[in-house]
């Protein structure tokens, strides 16, 4: 008989509420918890990560691309675009998240089972689409198996927030500021309402992204640059932009499939190879 191969169970922790609750629900089944850090995250994100480590009773591994920031990834590897307007793929996602995950996968000899924080609403077809986000993940990553603890238990976003609060864990600051996810500050996937809120809450980030758009002659929004955006455009109610993570990677994977030479172009600023660096905070590098 062939020996039984035990898979490696990995939670891709996004530092969002749903991801944290999903990880906690299956903590005894999970072998590794991994967070991909980007320097554009709100500083409170690492506080939340440390609180979750205590809640889980487990260490969260932190991986990070050596590009570190959204602007660096776009300038060094964006090839003149911030995100593709039709497909939604973001250059920063490709290099700051997707590449890091793929480099991890290349080092793993065991079958991989991924645990994701999608809630029950994301198991239903999206407006205008035949498939759900959950189905999209399975279709986009057929080499891995996938678990969705919140979906399996019928838990929605609101319930996940309630469960986190009941555990005494303060959610990331971006939620309390009125955002519906803990994405990078100034996420390039945001809509007009999102960007007008960023304009008020983080004016320096708004100005930096507007300058970046002009530098690469590509906009975050469809048909308008940020420095031309009507301050009254868009609206804030409802999710302002989707959670950053695997759905962004699905778009980026689609770009790879349709543009096989996309990543072969030389980048600006030297010949250093792509790679993953360790934790950005020594507390997590050396243990607490």
Task: Cite the ranges covered by each PLM segment.
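Nucleotide-activated chemistry modules centered on ATP-dependent adenylation/adenylyltransferase
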Residues: 1-288
């Amino acid at each position: 008989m062939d020996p039984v191969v035990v898979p490696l169970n990995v939670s891709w922790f996004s530092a969002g509420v749903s991801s944290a609750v999903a990880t906690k629900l299956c903590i005894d089944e999970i072998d590794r918890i991994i967070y991909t850090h980007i320097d554009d995250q709100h500083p409170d994100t690492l506080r939340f990560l440390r609180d979750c480590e205590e809640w889980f009773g487990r260490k969260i591994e932190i991986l990070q691309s050596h590009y570190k920031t959204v602007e660096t990834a776009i300038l060094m590897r964006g090839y003149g675009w911030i995100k593709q307007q039709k497909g939604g793929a973001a250059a920063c996602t490709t290099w700051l998240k997707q590449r890091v995950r793929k480099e991890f996968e290349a080092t793993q000899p065991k079958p991989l089972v991924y645990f994701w924080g999608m809630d029950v609403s994301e198991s239903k077809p999206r407006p205008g689409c035949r498939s759900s986000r959950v189905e999209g993940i399975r279709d986009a990553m057929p080499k891995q198996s996938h678990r969705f603890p919140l979906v399996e238990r019928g838990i929605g976003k609101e319930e996940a927030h309630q469960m986190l609060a009941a555990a005494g864990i303060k959610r990331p600051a971006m939620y309390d500021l009125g955002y519906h996810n803990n994405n990078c500050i100034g996420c390039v996937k945001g809509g007009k309402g999102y960007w007008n809120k960023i304009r008020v809450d983080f004016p320096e980030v708004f100005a930096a992204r507007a300058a970046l758009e002009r530098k690469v002659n590509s906009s975050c929004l469809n048909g308008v640059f940020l420095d031309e955006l009507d301050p009254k455009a868009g609206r804030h109610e409802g999710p302002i932009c989707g959670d950053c993570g695997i759905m962004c990677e699905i778009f980026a994977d689609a770009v790879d499939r349709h543009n096989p030479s996309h990543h072969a172009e030389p980048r600006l600023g030297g010949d250093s190879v792509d790679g993953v660096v360790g934790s950005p905070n020594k507390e997590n590098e050396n243990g607490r």
